[in-house]
Design a protein with these regions (language model features):
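An aromatic- and histidine-rich active-site surface loop
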Residues: 47-48, 117-132
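Extreme N-terminal starter segment of soluble prokaryotic enzymes
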Residues: 2-7
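Active-site proximal beta-strand in glycosyltransferases
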Residues: 116, 130-147
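A short, glycine/small-residue-rich beta-strand->loop->alpha-helix junction that serves as a flexible
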Residues: 10-23
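A nucleotide-sugar donor-handling region in carbohydrate enzymes
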Residues: 159-223
Length: 223
């Protein structure tokens, strides 16, 4: 009799893209057989998980992953930079947040004992998995994206992020293989990790749409 694998899904809580991708992947994983799934996030995404899986609440865990501080039109660069070492708008310094969340996440790693972890946006989980010799998959469509000269000061941060992503056992790119890659401008993999990279296509809903009566636009274009 096959033992159930324990699979952890770590979903970065900033925006809905990470959640949407992981839920599509989760559907496919559940088609492969009975396994024990655990979900990790915070805030609105954590609540969405509770609403989506009411019978699995014991396997849904809130982890306070650090996120950028919001501004009027997306993340506030100035506030996020200040927050690296200083408290801003009720947020502890980022270095404190990272240390605290990795400790909490590490305790859950030790308690659950994963066979596989899948991380969409949560780079810290890559580090924890590597230390414990657990297979980890990192889902992304960005790796060392090219920068305009006016944004070159972001380069050290991108190098740090790339280093953490590289700790995954495999890097799953949510895009088509070259030369049909849509986000190629954002993908600049170094030679030393090319063997880890797998293009898995777009995480889209493949449900068929029933063909109904032609709409006004279709009738117009057919004329």
């Amino acid at each position: 009799m096959r033992n159930m694998a324990k699979i952890g899904q770590f979903i970065y809580p900033w925006g809905n893209g990470h959640y949407s991708r992981m839920m599509r992947l989760n559907e496919r994983l559940k088609e492969l057989g009975d396994n024990e799934f655990h979900y990790f996030s915070k805030g609105d995404i954590y609540q969405k998980l509770l609403d989506k899986f009411p019978d699995e609440k014991q396997n849904i865990h809130e982890v306070l992953m650090p996120t950028p501080i919001d501004g009027k039109f997306g993340p506030s660069l100035a506030k996020s930079l200040w927050n690296f070492l200083l408290p801003v708008e009720g947020n502890e310094p980022l270095v404190t947040q990272i240390s605290s969340y990795l400790k909490d996440e590490g305790k859950l790693y030790n308690k659950i004992g994963f066979d596989l972890v899948i991380n969409d946006g949560d780079m810290g989980s890559n580090v924890l998995a590597e230390r414990r010799n657990i297979t980890s998959l990192f889902v992304t469509n960005q790796f060392k994206p090219k920068l305009w000269k006016s944004r070159i000061y972001f380069k050290p941060a991108l190098e740090f992020v790339a280093k953490q992503i590289s700790k995954a056992s495999k890097i799953l790119v949510a895009d088509s293989e070259p030369p049909y890659t849509m986000c190629e401008y954002n993908l600049n993999f170094t030679k030393d990790i090319q063997e880890k990279v797998v293009y898995v296509g777009h995480f889209t809903n493949e449900k068929k749409i029933e063909k109904g009566e032609k709409g006004d636009l279709e009738k117009f274009t057919d004329e």
